UniProtKB/Swiss-Prot annotation:
Keywords: Cell inner membrane, Cell membrane, Lipid biosynthesis, Lipid metabolism, Membrane, Phospholipid biosynthesis, Phospholipid metabolism, Transferase, Transmembrane, Transmembrane helix. The gene is plsY. The keyword Cell membrane applies. Pathway: Lipid metabolism; phospholipid metabolism. The chain crosses the membrane at residues 4-24, 56-76, 90-110, 124-144, 147-167, 191-211. This is Glycerol-3-phosphate acyltransferase. Belongs to the PlsY family. The keyword Ion transport does not apply. It is found in: Cell inner membrane. GO terms for cellular component: plasma membrane. Its EC number is 2.3.1.275.
Length: 232
């Protein structure tokens, strides 16, 4: 139990690092939540701080999810604080990753007012199911290219993930996943564990929930399209 609590606590604290708020303070001396969409995420960093800062914020937020889901669990597996949790390891990876997502949305370092969690959730799933996530990223980029609405890309990508896992696992009969090797050595495991379907559905529901205001603006025609380096 102590090891499990340590994993989710460390993962939550990693997710809580308020990347865009730190960037806003460092680059312009502002609280980014008072500008643009008012959100402390990568998309608003693109709008308010410019594309370079927005890209850096997004990549760091992605890394938070990946680190929390995979290296943190691996570290405590090698150095447990007592017994290691007796549960499916992919499920544990997902729980750790979701702890980071919760930390990003409800950051303890910024009054529990963070971002929407899309980049951190993506990072979690990149670490666990990288090939499926490459396909999801393709959906995300295509949706933004066609609509210039990041919210549309985020929602469609979130819905696409469990669908892609289900198609690869059951339609193409790929089992629990594949190991990809480089020069005869293990490189990365691309999981298709059934827990991904469950958590993928949870993540999709959470992303849709955190974008409920965006959905209302989309229907009313007032949603912000993606721009770079402008305050709106």
């Amino acid at each position: 139990m102590l090891t499990f609590l340590a994993i989710i606590t460390v993962a939550y604290l990693i997710g809580s690092i308020p990347t865009s708020i730190i960037a806003g303070r460092m680059l312009k001396g502002i609280d980014i939540r008072e500008f643009g969409s008012g959100n402390a995420g990568g998309t608003n960093a693109f709008r308010v701080l410019g594309w370079k800062a927005g890209l850096a914020v997004t990549l760091i937020d992605i890394a938070k999810g990946t680190i929390a889901a995979v290296p943190v669990v691996a570290f405590f597996k090698a150095h447990p604080l007592g017994a290691f949790p007796d549960m499916n390891e992919i499920a544990l990876n997902l729980i750790a990753g979701m702890s980071a997502v919760i930390g990003h949305v409800f950051t303890v370092f910024a009054g529990f007012k963070g971002g929407k969690g899309v980049s951190t959730a993506a990072g979690m799933l990149i670490g666990i199911a990288p090939i499926s996530m490459l396909m999801v990223i393709g959906v995300f980029i295509l949706a933004i290219t066609l609509t210039r609405y990041v919210s549309v890309g985020s929602i469609l990508a979130a819905i696409a993930f469990p669908l892609i896992i289900a198609i690869r696992k059951y339609l193409f009969d790929l089992g629990t996943g594949l190991d990809y090797h480089f020069f005869g050595k293990w490189l990365v495991h691309d999981s298709l564990d059934y827990h991904l379907l469950i958590f993928g559905g949870i993540v999709a529901a959470a992303i849709i929930y955190t974008h409920r205001a965006n959905i209302k603006r989309l229907f009313s025609g007032t949603e912000n399209r993606l721009t770079f380096g402008r305050r709106s």
